A protein has these predicted regions:
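A conserved hydrophobic secondary-structure block that centers on an alpha-helix together
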Residues: 89-97
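Disulfide-stabilized, aromatic/cysteine-rich ligand-recognition loop
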Residues: 1-9, 13-21, 25-81, 96-111, ...
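Functional-site microenvironments in short loops/helix caps that host divalent-cation chemistry
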Residues: 102, 106-108, 112, 116, ...
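Alpha-helical, largely C-terminal catalytic domains
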Residues: 82, 86
Length: 387
């Protein structure tokens, strides 16, 4: 039940909340269903205000009851009931669609569970490892190359689900045309070594590199390096505990503010989400995902052509605010609260990370976080305007 900060949630809460989602929206679709415990609507609802009030996120760590044993029993009970209805073929088509959404929702929380555990263990003075057996891979980074892309009018986004086959969140739709001016994208994400140069050059002390709110946050919280880098300059905290930092691996746990400041220092900028998605179109979704079981960004062998590590390793901050696409329509009913109401004061990230399930990601996937969020596996790929 450890909760290391207001933005994180205890592992027990993640387990209960994802189970509650199936109970509330799948089993609860039957008017005759009686909930496991009506009070849990309050405890494990996250933000669905149309259902009713929810226990405040900063206080989730105070929920000593129900116990972990009770939560695990709850997961077993609800899972058994859902599986029985699925096997019996008694679920309505609309409920089956919600079941699919529930599986996608569970995958999102699998990643959040890992990032929240990592933050909690880092806050522990002992620096415990979540997985002491995690292997590390050290390979020399490819030279950073600039890949020129011509101006084009193309399409981004996804066809609305479930009207069209293939799951996509409502914030990914509708598919629409965009004009993308000529630009260049970096061949790979920024490495730890490159980010260390930014620090050594006074990047965290140079106000002119920072957005105003970013500089204020940097000063208020005394940011001097990425979240999990040790002050000794050589180590970083991982889910395997404190480890020597691989200079060639993608830098991670950056806020939007830090990513933007680095880009300015490098004479570049962050890519727009349209630039990113058009570059990703047709690129195979392979990379270092949670399925790889590294649970940390990895350096890869040099490659001569193409974009490297576009998927997996680190979510890549874009310079695009999280806003609705033209013609956006949220899902109907309570599930309309899933994405649309958060379309303010957040920024889009793309590509997935080492904590993302491989089959959860796609080129059109829009992750989003506030500009000061640092505890996710977020890094940066640079872009430049073409002359």
């Amino acid at each position: 039940m450890v909760q290391s900060m207001d933005d994180a949630s205890p592992a027990k809460w993640h387990l209960a909340h994802t189970t509650w989602f199936f109970e509330r929206f799948v089993l609860g679709a039957d008017p005759a269903y009686r909930p496991h415990d009506p009070q849990w609507d309050y405890l494990f609802n996250s933000y669905y205000q149309s259902i009713g009030p929810a226990h405040a996120r900063p206080h989730r760590g105070l929920l000593s009851r129900p116990s972990l044993t009770q939560v695990l029993d709850y997961r077993s009970e609800i899972g058994t009931r859902v599986l029985a209805q699925l096997q019996a073929g008694t679920l309505e088509p609309q409920t089956l669609q919600i079941l699919e959404l529930g599986l996608q929702h569970e995958q999102q929380h699998q990643e959040l569970l890992l990032t929240d555990i990592k933050h909690a263990f880092w806050r522990n003075p002992l620096g415990p490892a979540y997985r002491a057996d995690l292997a590390t891979q050290h390979a020399p980074a490819s030279p950073l190359r600039w890949l020129q892309r011509d101006e084009q009018i193309g399409e981004i986004g996804a066809a609305p689900w479930p009207a069209h086959a293939g799951f996509a969140y409502d914030n990914e739709s509708p598919r629409h045309r965009v004009l993308v001016p000529a630009h260049a994208l970096a061949s790979r994400p920024v490495s730890n070594a490159e980010y260390a140069e930014f620090i050594a050059d006074g990047g965290y002390r140079t106000v002119g590199l920072w957005l105003s709110d970013g500089w204020a946050r940097r000063c208020a919280e005394d940011w001097q390096r990425p979240l999990y880098w040790h002050a000794d300059g050589a180590r970083e905290f991982t889910l395997g505990g404190w480890r020597e930092r691989d200079p060639h691996a993608p830098v991670c746990h950056l806020s939007l503010f830090e990513a933007d400041a680095f880009a300015r220092w490098a004479g570049a900028r962050l890519p727009t989400e349209a630039e990113w998605e058009q570059a990703a179109a047709g690129v195979a979704i392979v990379g270092n995902f949670v399925d790889t079981d590294a649970l940390h960004p990895q350096s890869t062998a040099p490659a001569d052509t193409g974009l490297q590590q576009l998927f997996g390793d680190v979510w890549e901050w874009t310079g695009s605010a999280y806003l609705p696409y033209p013609g956006f329509r949220p899902w109907s009913g309570t599930l309309g609260e899933y994405n649309g109401k958060f379309m303010n004061a957040q920024w889009v990230l793309r590509g997935g990370s080492c904590a993302t399930p491989r089959d959860h990601i796609r080129a059109s996937y829009r992750n989003f976080f506030p500009s000061d969020a640092r505890w996710q596996f977020a890094g940066v790929r640079l872009a430049k305007d073409s002359a």
